[in-house]
Amino acid sequence: MKTQIELARDGIISRQMEQVAADENFNPEIIRTRVAAGEIVIPCNPNRTNQKVVGIGTGLRTKINASIGTSSDICSIENEVQKAIAIEEEGADTLMELSAGGNLDKVRQEVLKAVNLPVGNVPLYQAFKETGRKYNDPSKLDPEFLFDLIERQLSDGLSFMAIHCGINQYTIERLRKQGFRYGGLASKGGTFMVAWMDATGKENPLYEQFDRVCTLMKKYDAVLSLGNGIRAGAIHDSHDRAQMAEMIINCELAELGREQGCQMMVEGPGHVPLDEIQANIILEKRMSGNAPYYVLGPIPADTGAGYDHITSAIGAASSTWHGADLICYITPAEHLALPTEADVREGVRATKLAVRIGDIAKYPDRRENERLASMARRDMRWDDLEQHLLFPDIARKTRASRAPEDGGTCTMCGDFCAMKKGNEIFKDDIKNDKIAPGA
């Protein structure tokens, strides 16, 4: 079986490429060209026939990933399945199943059955969890068990994986030599891999046997998302030498993976101050050959716990604007607790708004929906306005809960409604289209 990137290089427009082109209003040949170049990926494990086709990358609508998963403290398969269903209902594009407690195979399989979204994971979680259960010591992890586990997970139908290939002895040495890390290590999988390397004195097998990782991913046409295990967990650590060392390696691996016919994506931070986000995107795009960039937020302040879905949305709007391709949501529970169903819904909504704001800036020719919404608001055509809103159900419920006396207005202004008064003054004078320059 050939992967999407191999088919594209052979000049073949696959069914999945056709679907992405139709969904995004592109000529299929443009999609094929960008898939061939590694600028667009399409997670599409053939073992999962009910999966929604989603394109991620250059020129496409910025996509949203939402994550779920059990922990050692809270472990309910039913809860995670309900969260997965809620995430799909709210409009996320991809889902990561990141369980670390309970029957991990069962959680993954139930989630895969419950939704149609492309599903990914971090295989190191289960690898270290099961090793810890067996030996009471995660550092006893056998690399052969890890590779067997990756294939087992892929065979279930996972379409992308965050795999920490960029951590190696060199990146760890950079971290030790710089002598500081205000936020420590923020990646669970990355931290356990560093601990394994420290305990064994060996190189990271995911880096050392990178070709083997690519072979497994190619077998299932899954996207290899190069995880950032040394990412900054505090804005004061942003772009330190350790993070940059891993980023350089990941960007190099993205190129090597593409050469082997593997669909590749690079993961980004993390915690990044607002003034550094653009530079971060430029660096990844330049060094990776424009590989799709999967950004975890980013979170541009460290003091927003309880409202980090808002903190992250601000960073996500900026990173989307500057070229990020896939944004991982953050929920209000981030840094505090395992999220509830209500938390994941709120996280998707905040991120949905953030990427819309970012896409308006990234693609100025895609603002028509905003224009139509504005005109409907101006004319007090409430039913028409709802058709153009990101969250029509919320808008409808809020307005109905405090209904105005005049059905054309709302209770914010009542008799002082600027829209109503403006329509009385100007009637049809301001209802024409703007004349384009030079027309």
UniProtKB/Swiss-Prot annotation:
- The enzyme's first-digit EC class, named in words, is lyase
Signal peptide start-end: none
Q: Name the positions where [4Fe-4S] cluster binds.
A: C410, C413, C417
Query: What superkingdom does the record give?
Result: Bacteria
* Entry GO MF terms: 4 iron, 4 sulfur cluster binding; cobalamin binding; lyase activity; metal ion binding
Q: Does the keyword Translocase apply?
A: no
The record's catalysed reaction(s) read: 5-amino-1-(5-phospho-beta-D-ribosyl)imidazole + AH2 + S-adenosyl-L-methionine = 5-hydroxybenzimidazole + 5'-deoxyadenosine + formate + L-methionine + A + NH4(+) + phosphate + 2 H(+)
A Pfam family = ThiC_Rad_SAM
Membrane-spanning segments: none
Q: What Enzyme Commission number(s) apply to this enzyme?
A: 4.1.99.23
List the GO terms this entry assigns under cellular component, sorted alphabetically: cytosol
**Where along the chain is substrate bound?**
M96, Y125, H164, S187, K188, G189, N228, G229, I230, R231, E267, Y294
What's a GO biological-process term for it?
cobalamin biosynthetic process
Q: Which cofactor does it need?
A: [4Fe-4S] cluster
Q: Which residues are noted in the entry as Zn(2+)-binding?
A: H271, H335
Oligomeric and partner information: Homodimer.
Q: Which PANTHER family match?
A: PHOSPHOMETHYLPYRIMIDINE SYNTHASE, CHLOROPLASTIC, THIAMINE BIOSYNTHESIS PROTEIN THIC
Q: Which family does it belong to?
A: Belongs to the ThiC family. 5-hydroxybenzimidazole synthase subfamily.
Q: What is this protein called?
A: 5-hydroxybenzimidazole synthase
The species is: Desulforapulum autotrophicum (strain ATCC 43914 / DSM 3382 / VKM B-1955 / HRM2) (Desulfobacterium autotrophicum)
Q: What is the lineage of its organism?
A: Bacteria, Pseudomonadati, Thermodesulfobacteriota, Desulfobacteria, Desulfobacterales
